[in-house]
Swiss-Prot record:
Species per Swiss-Prot/TrEMBL record: Stenotrophomonas maltophilia (strain R551-3)
Stated name of the protein: Probable chemoreceptor glutamine deamidase CheD
Entry keywords, A to Z: Chemotaxis, Hydrolase
Reaction catalyzed: L-glutaminyl-[protein] + H2O = L-glutamyl-[protein] + NH4(+)
Membrane among keywords: no
Hydrolase keyword on record: yes
Record-level Gene Ontology MF annotations: protein-glutamine glutaminase activity
Signal peptide span: none
Role, per record: Probably deamidates glutamine residues to glutamate on methyl-accepting chemotaxis receptors (MCPs), playing an important role in chemotaxis.
E.C. no: 3.5.1.44
Amino acid sequence: MNASLRTDDVMRYQDARFKTIAAKLLPTQYLVVDDTTALTTTLGSCVAACLRDPVLKIGGMNHFLLPEGNAGDGAPARYGSYAMELLINDMLKRGAHRKRIEAKVFGGANVLKGFTSNPVGTRNAEFVRQYLQAEHIPIIAEDLCGIHPRKIWFFADTGRVVVQRLPHAHEAEVAATESAVRARLSKAPVTGGVELFE
């Protein structure tokens, strides 16, 4: 599997709760849609940014694990900043206007036990806020940090987001999934690049 964010293999299914097609994003995935597809993901310490151009009613979501990579891995942007650039660039390619893009951000819970100093969830939350501020993209809603994992559904056509905080019973499962993806990414070769659009 490619270590860079991807839109391939995004699982789509009929969501019974919302009676619509949903696309479930896993860590390292992102997707942009211009229809009624619900974008959904489950977050622990990871962060998902939901971006939207309200005029075109197009939006997208990413799911990243870390704000940045190790300085020595040759690709510090393959995590948070890479995820954000890919999502923004894909929206711009589809006609979104940078000055109209707005953000809703979620996740960054501190679910990994034993990480009390500079926890990854807090770092992810700080990163996404600072990144969007630097890009002049307003955050119009957020649910970041805390101790509970979350499941979110984002409806790009309306901008609606539904957040379900998961009980403590799910923490171990979410933390194990995130840890496994981190381990896989740390061993994967660095590939790909980012093309910036203004």
